[in-house]
Regions:
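Nuclease catalytic cores that cleave nucleic-acid phosphodiester bonds
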Residues: 15-157
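Short, positively charged and aromatic/hydrophobic N-terminal segments
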Residues: 9-10
Length: 157
């Protein structure tokens, strides 16, 4: 009798996980995901209602970082995390996932520490001075995000 060893191979498919509460590029994410046949998981707190007919939607209790931790808990190496939150981006990178912000900036081990440092310094400055908020979002910001996300997917798929 001959013995055969069957090799079991797990194939992992990239997914897009979105810290979606204040995400201004949900439409762009869905456009690319549908084109690339990727799953999308949108994470919201319970102050939001959302349905797009494509994404898996998670509605979580409104609380300290509940959305952030739920997103990171299901993330895996190779996923793309869309977030404005440097802490979430840091945790994503530690899991060997990719992280990108709403303007198309791809977070990496080289830039995340300087971003965290700058955030801390800016928080100190804001406490002592009246500073304006971020500039108004433009259509070009959405185009930049779309192009960066598409490039990130194509380079790592």
């Amino acid at each position: 009798s001959f013995g055969f060893i069957k090799e079991c191979v797990t194939i992992y498919v990239m997914r897009i996980l979105v810290d979606a509460d204040a995400c201004p590029v949900k439409k762009e994410i869905l456009d690319i995901a549908k084109k690339q046949l990727l799953e999308v998981h949108m994470f919201f707190d319970n102050a939001h209602e959302y349905e797009d007919g494509y994404s898996t939607v998670y509605i979580l209790d409104k609380g300290a970082d509940s959305v952030d931790y739920a997103l990171i808990n299901i993330s895996q190496s190779g996923d793309i995390i869309v977030t404005q939150d440097y802490g979430v981006a840091t945790m994503a990178l530690s899991k060997k996932a990719f992280a990108i912000n709403q303007n198309g900036l791809v977070y990496d081990d080289d830039n995340i520490m300087s971003l965290l440092t700058n955030r801390a310094m800016n928080q100190k400055i804001r406490r002592h001075k009246n500073m304006k908020g971020p500039k108004k979002r433009t259509q070009q910001d959405n185009v930049s995000f779309y192009n960066s996300l598409e490039k990130l997917i194509n380079m790592n798929k």
